[in-house]
Amino acid sequence: MKLLKSLAVSAMALLFAATAQAKEVTLLMDWFPQGNQSVFWQAMLDNDEHDLKINVKAGGPGINTAAQTAAGSVEFGLQGSDSVMAANAKGAGLVAVFANLDHVPYTLVFHPDQGIKTIQDLDGRRFAVKMGVTYWKWVKAEYGVSADEFPLKGDLALFAREKEMFQQGYSLFLPARLAAQGVATDQITLESLGYRPYSVLFTTQKMIDENPELVQEVVDRLRAAFAKSLNNPDPTADLILSKSKKVTRDIHMGAIELMKADFLPKDYSKLGCMKSERWEELSAQLKQVDMVPGDFDASSSYNLSFLGNCE
């Protein structure tokens, strides 16, 4: 009888230990599945090799990634560093721990036969834009331009018809999608104008305070997955393209090459790295357009300690 009790206690202890080790986190993306998210989908594909299970959840219209992460509905979210600071100005308590792109690939796309050479040449034109987007507030203030803004609905046919309008998008995808439909484009990137927020994975300060080991494990997993997905992009391409039909395989693979050329470090050991100076630069730009208060402390919105090896 004592032996049976002992075995039962041992079994319960083993079950408890197994349950305690069954760690799981959810990463909420900034948009539908697409190539700039490859690192996160690769991490999910690698789950069988690790105790920590990383689930990736697609974003999209009407999904507020920052708000859901701040509320604890998910453990991590993906957005621009400008969105993180704007949310923190309202008390969200978010902290970026990993950059998946050196800058969000915001771009302004227009028809090439309109005589547009500079940002000022877009003044007064119709503009398909995500209403209230932070970068456009800064562009208007910095360059003194305005536009006839209307909500972006992703209607490429409208852009093809209206020769004088311009449209926001990601430089990794929008020009290539239009080219595939026979529509020639030119573009002005926000990075070329001096606005360059990181694309970042963030969590909450509460998570960092209560479970820093878990945050570190996620960051380490992402670094390994990132290099893996860049060296062999086919598995993540298969997964992403099965979930979203907005781009072809050629466009997806082209975006990966653009990322490697212009958005990622050549040394893959530096993947995920960020610099304090860039956060301070962006904070000053956000203060310029009253997106954060004048006394806002940018350092409260990021934590470099999980990255290491970034010098």
Predicted ranges, named:
Residues M1-A8:
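Bacterial N-terminal signal peptides that target proteins for export
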Residues E210-M291:
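Secondary-structure end/capping motifs
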Residues E24-L152, L156, A160-R161, M165-G169:
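Short, glycine-/small- and polar/acidic-enriched structural segments
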Residues Q42-A43, Y106-I116, Y198-L214, D267:
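A bilobed periplasmic-binding-protein/Venus flytrap-type ligand-binding module shared by bacterial periplasmic
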Residues L15-A20:
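N-terminal signal peptide c-region/cleavage motif recognized by signal peptidases
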Residues D51-I54, V183, K245, L271:
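N-terminal secretory/targeting leader peptides
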Residues D82, D148, L152-K246:
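Pocket-lining segment of extracytoplasmic ligand-binding domains
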Residues E280-E311:
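Conserved C-terminal helix/tail region of periplasmic/extracytoplasmic solute-binding proteins
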